[in-house]
Amino acid sequence: MTTSHRPQLEARSGTKSGVAGEYVPTGVKHARLLPGHRTVKRRREGGATAEDEERERAGAETRTVDCNEGTDELAGEGRSAGSGDGDEASSAEDSSDADDEDDVDNPEELRRELEALRASKTGAKTGAKTGAKTGEKGAGGGGWRAGAVFGRQKRRREQAEGRAYRNDVTQSEYHQDFLRRLTK
């Protein structure tokens, strides 16, 4: 009879030991025995807040100001040389340009604002974490979903932090304990 045409998950590879005639296992493992992934991808708590959006907008504004530093002067000259049809609109634009120029002239103020945004962001993060640990519901969401089935499961999972998650069953603590107890 011939061999079955199936892949061997653990082919007999190794040498026989002289004492008991058993095969000595090698360090080669089949790909199916390796863990599927090594880290658990977790969702961020809360989601995007107003402070995140402000920080992103502020970052975009500073980038546009940096890119347009030389072009503001050229645009101002072009407007003054233009026709007088849109005097009110151009005066409004000039006043906003003046505000932008003040911001560019005072990099210290920009730094202070940036530091204040960072401080408020870190304060909000720590407040959200402490609120989540104490069970308070913040303005970041939650709502009825936190009390639903998957929300309760998430809380139980967070409470059982002592156990480490492993996708590799043969290397998990549970399996190792099982082998220690039942095999001798």
From Swiss-Prot:
The keyword Nucleus is annotated on this UniProt entry: yes
Compositional bias segments (type: Basic and acidic residues): 55-66, 108-118, 174-184
Biased composition (Low complexity): 119-133
Disordered: region residues: 1-184
Example of a GO cellular component annotation carried by this entry: catalytic step 2 spliceosome
Keywords assigned by UniProt, alphabetized: mRNA processing, mRNA splicing, Nucleus, Spliceosome
Main localization category: nucleus
Record's compositionally biased regions (Acidic residues): 85-107
Subcellular location: Nucleus
Family membership noted in the UniProt record: Belongs to the CWC15 family.
Summary of the function given for this chain in its UniProt record: Involved in pre-mRNA splicing.
Protein name, per record: Pre-mRNA-splicing factor CWC15
Originating species: Eremothecium gossypii (strain ATCC 10895 / CBS 109.51 / FGSC 9923 / NRRL Y-1056) (Yeast)
